[in-house]
Amino acid sequence: MATPAPRPLRVLFFRTDAGNEPVREWLLALSSDEKKTIGADILAVQWVWPVGKPLVDSLGGGLWEVRSSLGERIARVFFIVIREDIILLHGIIKKSRTTPKQELDLARKRQSLYIQLTDPIHENKNVSKRPPRK
């Protein structure tokens, strides 16, 4: 009997109270080639999670980043994994080697909001904190 094909994780966009999806809006503002590159990287994470460096890095506390190289630019998409879902929280184009604190703070704020809204007892026990396989 054949082994069933692996099922990909579902990708969801964080949605604000106003109904905006900041990562989707950020992606739409990028060039076609940049969207394709970032989309392919997210697709790889979706199908082979857990993934390690250089594609994905843990930022601690269940927050992860997809690291996409866009030629002269570098993109980061911050996300969490809950059960079988990848939730895209925030996207940036990096302008320096370090990620600005305000960008990380925003991603962590969205992480907290998402967990509070989706987990009735406000626990993040289902958030993947496990380091990816190397």
What are these regions (language model features)?
Residues 1-74, 83-86, 93-134:
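Basic, Lys/Arg-enriched alpha-helical interface segments
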